[in-house]
């Protein structure tokens, strides 16, 4: 018999898996790489109502991930419960069609504790701060600790308990870039939260990203956050969008066609503040620019979709990176028509401004040269025609 034959021996009996093994299996879906762990921990902090998050990593998150927040915190009673699989405070009515938080499955913390060395220190308004540790699935006793209101979660030696996973990780540089991209996306989704990302590799402390808290989540605040995270060029070459159809609101900033990119790396989609990489949304954005941009170029955009929780199912992917809308064609239509309209309006405005400026310049030139000969007049006419045919978005 081939050694890879998958036939089950009659001697094997069905048995219940150990809780530690279950958590390790779950970790394979929840935590693919250090950036996945960072995402889960930051989302927990945001769900806890924090206004400031500091993320510290070392060696691309392989040896250290530490997330510090000023959220509600957990009591000494909640700490051990939070480490149980499928224990959560985010489904009060057990309704998966009415999710108003990032997390809801109760899988992140037990999964992280199963594959790494996890330490949680938390302080709420109750009886002070407490600490609990998990090493490869083994939970320690709770003990008193010191810290202000909020939670600190420290994950060391990710995948030490499942060493086979380590060889699938990329270089430290690549893993750090993935973490940086994750933090950028989450910071764009929640402009009313301050973010600081620090690389502590080699015992040093290098600040990679720092953005201050914006006053709200308005379009103006979103633009400020985008400018700080993506740069002034994006801000200067983008236009705002704010359209509503029935119970769905589409807001954000989309680039001018002249600001085309070589890849789709600068495309951000948020559904009820949750960042997603959904093929349907990516395709809709592509379709919106099909008349303005070559196929080998990509638009830059930050698109926020707000809708009722029961209008979208976020429980269709282990990493929650994909969603399923009740009316997918309606969402696509809203994106395509909404973006095309704002681009057309901006193009008309730019064209009118350009034509007015060109006409003024030509009149000034004619006024200064009253005796222009026929050759000069012909030249001026050609210049005027060229100006009119200029790109709308320059």
Please describe what each predicted stretch is.
Residues 1-392:
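N-terminal phosphate-binding caps/lids of nucleotide- and nucleic-acid-binding domains
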């Amino acid at each position: 018999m081939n050694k890879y034959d998958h036939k089950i021996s009659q001697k094997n009996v069905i048995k219940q898996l150990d809780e530690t093994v279950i958590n390790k299996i779950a970790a394979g879906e929840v935590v693919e790489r250090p950036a996945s762990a960072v995402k889960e921990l930051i989302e927990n902090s945001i769900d806890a109502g924090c206004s400031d998050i500091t993320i510290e990593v070392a060696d691309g998150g392989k040896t250290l991930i530490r997330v510090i927040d000023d959220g509600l915190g957990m009591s000494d009673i909640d700490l051990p419960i939070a480490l149980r699989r499928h224990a959560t405070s985010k489904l009060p009515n057990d309704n998966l069609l009415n999710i108003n938080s990032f997390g809801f499955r109760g899988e992140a913390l037990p999964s992280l504790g199963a594959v790494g060395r996890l330490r949680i220190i938390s302080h709420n308004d109750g009886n002070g701060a407490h600490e609990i540790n998990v090493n490869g699935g083994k939970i320690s006793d709770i003990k008193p600790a010191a810290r202000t209101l909020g939670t600190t979660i420290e994950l060391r030696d990710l995948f030490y308990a499942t060493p086979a996973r380590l060889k699938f990780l990329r270089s430290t540089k690549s893993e750090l870039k993935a973490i940086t991209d994750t933090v950028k996306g989450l910071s764009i989704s929640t402009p009313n939260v301050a973010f600081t990302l620090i690389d502590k590799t080699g015992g040093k402390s290098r600040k990679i990203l720092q953005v201050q808290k914006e006053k709200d989540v308005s379009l103006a605040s979103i633009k400020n956050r985008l400018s700080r995270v993506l740069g002034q060029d994006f801000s200067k070459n983008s236009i705002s969008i704010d359209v509503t159809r029935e119970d769905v609101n589409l807001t954000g900033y989309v680039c001018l066609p002249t600001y085309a990119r070589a890849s789709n790396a600068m495309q951000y989609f948020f559904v009820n503040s949750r960042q997603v990489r959904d093929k349907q949304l990516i395709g809709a954005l592509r379709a919106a620019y099909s008349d303005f941009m070559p196929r080998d170029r990509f638009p830059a955009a930050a698109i926020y979709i707000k809708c009722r929780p029961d209008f979208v199912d976020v429980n269709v992917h282990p990493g929650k990176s994909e969603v399923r809308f009740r009316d997918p064609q309606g969402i696509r239509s809203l994106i395509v028509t909404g973006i095309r309209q704002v681009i057309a309006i901006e193009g008309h405005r730019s064209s009118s401004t350009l034509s007015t400026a060109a006409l003024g310049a030509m009149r000034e030139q004619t006024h200064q040269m009253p005796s222009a000969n026929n050759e000069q007049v012909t030249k001026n006419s050609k210049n005027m025609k060229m100006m009119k045919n200029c790109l709308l978005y320059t």
